[in-house]
Structure formats: C-alpha cells, structure tokens
From Swiss-Prot:
Membrane spanning residue stretches: none
Keywords from the UniProt entry: Transferase
Lineage, broadest ranks: Eukaryota, Fungi, Dikarya, Ascomycota, Pezizomycotina
Protein name: Xanthone prenyltransferase A
Stretches of the chain forming a coiled coil according to its record: none
Amino-acid positions noted as binding dimethylallyl diphosphate in the UniProt annotation, renumbered to this chain: R113, K199, Y201, R263, K265, Y267, Y369, Y440
Organism of derivation: Emericella nidulans (strain FGSC A4 / ATCC 38163 / CBS 112.46 / NRRL 194 / M139)
Amino acid sequence: MLKHSSAATKENDSPKLKVLDIVSKLEPSLDHSHTHWWKLTSPQLALMLEAADYSIEKQFETLLFHYHWVVPYLGPKPDADGNFKWRSLVSDVGIPLEYSWKWDTATSGPDVRLTIEPINELSGTRVDPLNQAPSLELLHRLAEILPRLDVSWASHFLSTFYDHDKLKYIKESESETGMPLRSTMLVCFEFGRNGITTKTYMSPRKLGQQGFAPLSDYHSAIAALGPSCALDAVTEFLNNSPEGPHLSPFMLAVDNIIPCSSRLKLYFATPRTSYNSIREVLTLGGRLSTVTLESKLRAIHELVKAIMPFPPDLPDDADIPFPEQVLSPTVQDLAESSDMANQRPAFVAGYQYYFDIAPGASLPDIKFYIPIRKAQMNDQAVATGLTNWMRAQGRGAFCNAYTRVLEGLAGGRDLSKCHGLHTHICVMLKGNGEFDVTSYLAPGCK
C-alpha cells in the first residue's frame, strides 16, 4: 500500500508548513478527487519548497499554482481498491506525478519541479484514446497567466507524431495484436526563483506501431523545423559508434517558450551500463573533449558506484549485472514489445540519456540518467551514496534538507525499508566544468 505524509497537513504540525496551513484553510475544496490529490501532494510539495529555502512569497505562489493548475488535472482519484480509471506510466504506483529536486550550484539554491500526466474523465475513451486533450487544455489556459508560454513546437510535434483517426486507436487496442493505450503526453512545471516555466514531453504513437517509435519518426519531425547541426552530429554518432545500435529513442521534450530559446531534447534508453559505454555517449564518440573531461567522467562514475548495485572490481568494459527478476534487455526488447508498460522493468534497469539538438547548436548538450534499481537498493542507501558524493563535490549545503524531503515522502517509514522514492538521478557536465545534478522522486513508496 502506498504510504504518504498525510500527517503533515495537521494544523500547527510544524512552523515550516504554516504557508500550507493558510492556503488549505482559505481555498475551498473543488471536488472529492481534488481533495484527495491536494491532501496527498500539497504537504510533499510544501516540504520540498521549504527545504529548498524558497522565500515565503514563492512558497505561497507555488502552492496556489499547484492548487489551481496542477491538482485539478491529476484526474479522478483511485477507487476503493486503489484502481485508476487511467493508469499513468509517470510512476509505477499509478499516481500521475513525479517530483524533481535540482541540486544547488555555486550560484543558486535547489529548484523544485514536478511532472504530471494531465488526466480527466474522458482519458482513454473514444473521445481521447491517447489522453492528450487534458494537456492541451491545460497549456491553452496557462497561456493566460504565463506570458512567456509558447506552444509552437509542442503543436508541431503533436501534428506529426500521431494519427488523427481516434476510433482506429480504440479498435487497434482491442485487437489481439494491437498495442494497448498508454501515456503519450506529459507536462512539467519548473518552479524557478524568477517564475514558473513549463515543458511538454511526447512519445510518438502511430497506428500499427509496436512498442516505442523508431528514430525515423523523430528525425523527420525534427528535420521539418529546419537544419540542425546538433541533430546531424547525433545521427552520425548513432550510425558509427558501437553504442549506437544499443540506443533506442523513447521520448522528446521541448520548452514551452519561443522556439529560438527552447531546448529540443531527444531521449534514448540503452541496456548498456559499463563505464566505457558512459564515456562513449557523453563524449559523443570523442567529439566532445576538454582537458579535465576524463576526471569529470570518473567522478560521474563514482556516483554510479554509490547509488547502483555495483560489483567490486567490475571492469570498465563490463555492464552492471541485471537483477535476477529482470533479464538483461536487448534493444529489440526495448523497441518492439507490444505494451510499453510491460517494458518498464527492463527499461528502467539500463541507462538513459538525452541529447539537446535544438537548431542553432553545433553539438548537443548531453544529460545522463542513472536508474535506481529499487529491488536492489533501498532509499536510505541511495540517499547516503548521493549525499556523500555531493559533499565530496563541495556541495553539501542542502544534503540534510534533502534527507528531510525523503523522510516526508516516505510518510514516516524508515528509509532503509523504502524502495522506489528515488526513480533516477541525472547528471550533466556543463561547459564550466560544474555538474548539474537532479533527483527524480516518486510521491510515495510501496
């Protein structure tokens, strides 16, 4: 059963939740589902904002935004047996929300973000088989209060990634060989110190498709935006690197701002988990190089060792063994299973990367996602490994606050008995040699 910190909503429970107490008192309940999701998520978000040292004003702004713009789009609450009308793939507990904690840098404190799959009563029905209407409605309405919001790129990919005959999607999903209806569109909210911004995530889904879409579907849609040297560099890498055949695309994301300022992030999964594989991808086969690059890559690998079930003396060219209950996936497993939900255990056991290939860039920025194998690593072990690594980088100022966040998400359970609060830890090596580090966190653990 999912555990969460319902106790955090009690009146005068803690001074740090005073902002939440005020918002909860003054804002009326909208309906039973809204009340359910608010009671589950608002104490968690309030705790994260306080732990990240947001100002009181920003805490009010963010919680009010969450109340009016996020919670109403989390969909119908689960029934008495815990079943969801539309089961989102955002988290493996079915809740259509994931938090992220972007760690502090030399010049800024942590940033709190969350990603949702907007859902309503018609999600997965003949009216909206791919569950995209709630996301579109949300973005359209947000344009009225977020003046920088621009959905030009999201609209472009929406028009190219999907077929328009909704009834055929329903009929296909009901056939013996058709792929079940699954999540295809997510919205991320970044609660920055200077304002709220959004991103849209999409996974292509064409009629007749089995599993994740091929790279060609992404390539043609991206190429239609104009020439991209970064895309050309990634394509050349995939065609010529020994790691290329192992990388399978699964998602694309854009910032909802004017295209000339937006990132265009193409996500890949791979079953390969060796150090040599990390090095090959993060250097784009040697195309990216600096004097200190090797030492930085070794530091990233030390983080891998700290939060993964890493065997002693594993050679640089060897993959981390997969858990017994998850057979080592092949690229074909990742790309061709008829149901993306069935791919999840193998999918999250390997590494993930994104390449920022926005037009105008000569080479892509690359971010590396380390999966948390929750069957093998409890959340206390992950937290200890991560915070020790952050302290070793001279960035330990918020480690204790981060642990408090985890304890809140665990709802009072011992972190050593929790598996699944951490979903991924991601790292990007910036041009100045500093690491961007982000923790992705579930809204509870089983």
